[in-house]
Amino acid sequence: MRHRKSGRHLSRTSSHRKAMFQNMAVSLFEHELIKTTLPKAKELRRVAEPLITLAKEDSVANRRLAFDRTRSKEIVGKLFNDLGKRYATRQGGYLRILKCGFRAGDNAPMAYVELVDRPIGGSVEAAE
């Protein structure tokens, strides 16, 4: 029985899932808008939001934790210099998930994941 088991397997091994969500989080923080399937978007929220909460308090220990979870110096810099300051007063809910129809090949439900209060310069086509 799967009672009280949280998280989705997404037909992947645990190492594949970890690597996939690490890469998706880096892409999300880099572009601030990505397009993915709805179940992946809902799971990505569980990975990305704690990183922004971590970035709200700038310390060497927090930077090392963020680097351990993203493996990207550029993204750690953006998290602590830009996103941590942008969401300093927000208590959570840093991501918005917008349903955007179904994928043509297999009819999978798709969604946009974007950072709340992001600058309105980015285009939706860049996310695809």
UniProtKB/Swiss-Prot annotation:
Keyword Ribonucleoprotein: yes
GO BP annotation list: translation
Any Gene Ontology CC annotation: cytosolic large ribosomal subunit
Pfam families: Ribosomal_L17
The keyword NADP appears for this protein: no
Keyword field: Ribonucleoprotein, Ribosomal protein
Listed InterPro entries: Ribosomal_bL17, Ribosomal_bL17_CS, Ribosomal_bL17_sf
Domain of life: Bacteria
Family: Belongs to the bacterial ribosomal protein bL17 family.
Protein name from the UniProt record: Large ribosomal subunit protein bL17
Native source organism of the sequence: Pseudomonas syringae pv. syringae (strain B728a)
Phylogenetic placement of the source organism: Bacteria, Pseudomonadati, Pseudomonadota, Gammaproteobacteria, Pseudomonadales
The encoding gene: rplQ
